[in-house]
């Protein structure tokens, strides 16, 4: 199991950042590897809300497991999904800046030695996606790694 975290500082108020980040249908706007995310449950966003995610090479269903408005949102894949992952965003207000701690637990199904080798690449790719999130929220537009331009 890979475990890592990244931190990014976004020059926007916490409420604005949390609203965008906790709506997981926004992920394709800042993560080029995720093609689509759809909310499956009809309830308002909160603990228990489920989503279906389509990435370039696979698909997963996941559920919100922790939700504290303007502070924390965490998700975990449902049992039938692979790869298995848990992700937690923790936000704190620092004036008009919002630091986001992005914590991951990712089951790769690979031996520990191989996990260590790919771990740095995965962490780096996630960090790069977070810089795209920062740019999108601060500038209102971003060009993703695959050349797609997104505006909000």
Regions found by a protein language model. Name each.
Residues 1-41, 132, 138-139, 151-152:
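Hydrophobic ligand-binding cavity/cleft-lining segments
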Residues 67-74, 131:
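Eukaryotic helix-grip
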Residues 49-56, 73-80:
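Short beta-strand segments that buttress and anchor functional surface loops
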Residues 79-128, 133-135, 144-147:
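Beta-strand/loop substructures that line and gate deep hydrophobic ligand-binding cavities in soluble
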Residues 14, 42, 65-70, 90-99:
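A short, structured loop/turn motif at beta-sheet edges
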Residues 6-8, 60-66, 77, 85-93:
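Hydrophobic/aromatic beta-strand elements that line small-molecule binding cavities or substrate pockets
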């Amino acid at each position: 199991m890979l475990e890592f975290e990244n931190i990014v500082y976004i020059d926007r108020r916490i409420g604005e950042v949390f609203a965008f980040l906790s709506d997981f249908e926004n992920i394709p706007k800042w993560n080029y590897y995720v093609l689509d995310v759809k909310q499956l449950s009809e309830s308002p966003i909160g603990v228990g809300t489920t989503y279906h995610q389509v990435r370039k090479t696979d698909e997963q269903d996941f559920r919100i497991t922790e939700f504290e408005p303007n502070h924390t949102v965490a998700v975990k894949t449902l049992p039938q999904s692979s790869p298995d992952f848990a992700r937690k965003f923790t936000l704190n207000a620092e004036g008009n800046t919002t630091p986001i701690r992005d914590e991951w637990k990712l089951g790769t199904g690979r031996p520990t030695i191989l996990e260590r080798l790919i771990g740095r690449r995965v962490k780096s790719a996630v960090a790069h996606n977070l810089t795209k999130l920062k740019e999108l929220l601060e500038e209102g537009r971003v060009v993703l790694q695959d050349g797609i331009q997104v505006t909000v």
